[in-house]
Amino acid sequence: MLEKIYFYYTNDLHSDFEHWSRVAGYLKGAKANHNTKNESCWLLDIGDHVDRVHPIAEAFMGQANIRLMNDVGYDLATIGNNEGITLAHEDLFHLYDKANFQVVCANFHNVQGKEPEWLNTTVTIQSINGVKIGIIALTAPFNAFYELLGWYISPPYNTLARYIKELEESTDVIVFMSHLGINEDQEIARRFPQLDVIIGGHTHHLLRQGEIVNNAVITAAGKHCAFVGEVILTWDHSAQKLIKKEAYTTDITHLEKDQQTEETLHELFVEATTQLDQSVIEMKHPLDVQWFEHTEVMQRLTNTLKEWTNAEFAMLNAGLLLDHLPAGKVTYGDIHRICPHPINPCVVELSGDELVEVIRASFTKELMELTLKGFGFRGEVIGRMIYSGLTVETEFLSDGNEYVSKVTCNGEPLDPNKNYLVATADMFTFGRLLPEIARSKTKKYFLPEFLRDLLADTLRKSFST
């Protein structure tokens, strides 16, 4: 006898609810269809469902996301870095308390005491006809952030090696839910032939059809749930083995919306708006925001960052603030609207030479006009860099490009060999935006505060009537 086993999954929604009602309708319909046919079917989420960029996620600290997943009927989920490092310890500890699904993450640990009651290292599920399926999940080890919040992520390969033998002996099929990224998924498939399926996320890669690496089929559905993934396994009960593995992703952006989900989203948005309608200050004059010009609010915010982190200098890009603020009452919702990024303050150590190189790079047209999505940045462009504690003099070339002619502190040039503490946004410590910052061996992150918390302090201190 042949038995087909079905998994449907989502990954990296990032609280982008544009297509969520379509996702909900599609998944509920798929599950109902398989139940009618008496076929085994599970719904999975691979992490980063929560992202505090959206007011619903911000107001409810992720709890509304769990409600939405419950409504759809998810069976299993794992933790992404947006759940893991953008919530305070207590908020994450209780995030899944009301989940009607099992949460799996084998390398996630609480260093402040007992593990959350919802946390499972592995889970074993069973098909209608008795096929035992082992589920293991891992999340990306951003321990520089996790440890500041009271968590620890154990090394993925060591963790997998620890549990894989037990799963191999006790189950027929092993499914790995991975919030590690495509490169890690491929390497893990090469190293662990025991894995049958790797369902991925984190790096927002879209695999329209499954990719076979070693013994595993690898799949992932991009970002923001424009696609939903499906895995179909065929088990031969006579031969007692898996004879076929298929993986696909389906574009759901053209499907009809689930009206019940639409109503729930509307209710949550109204309630979130009410919760975020807490007055921060009253402003006598409107606040101007410009991405490519020096503004008072960006200068004051950069000054606050320098003072708050006790750094010698500070630098922030003007693109962090997305919109103006009107005169009158300013609420926390307004602050979230103009600074929605899950970006933390950080301090890096740079030599005088490295700092000057960073400053020169920041004034290039290429960086200022760079359209960026990722590293926590949820805006449009990087914009002009604003500095505190430094005087940066620039001139314009005949082609209109601006270049740095002089950098001083209290009228004196920087010592090229001296190390300085520079406060900035943590987004610059990732990737290649500003290589000198990313390469710095001394980085100190500040959590759970976001830059918008410092913006609120700045407004209270400098702009209140």
Can you annotate each of these PLM segments?
Residues 237-330, 462-464:
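A short C-terminal boundary segment appended to hydrolase-like catalytic domains
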Residues 116-132, 151-154, 176-179, 183, ...:
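Amphipathic, soluble alpha/beta structural segments
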Residues 8-11, 285-288, 436-437:
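Glycine- and acidic
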Residues 27-34, 161-164, 168-171, 192, ...:
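Structural signal for hydrophobic packing residues in well-ordered secondary-structure cores
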Residues 17, 326-465:
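Feature captures C-terminal
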Residues 137-140, 222-224, 237, 319, ...:
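A broadly conserved detector of short glycine/acidic/proline-rich loop/turn motifs that flank catalytic sites
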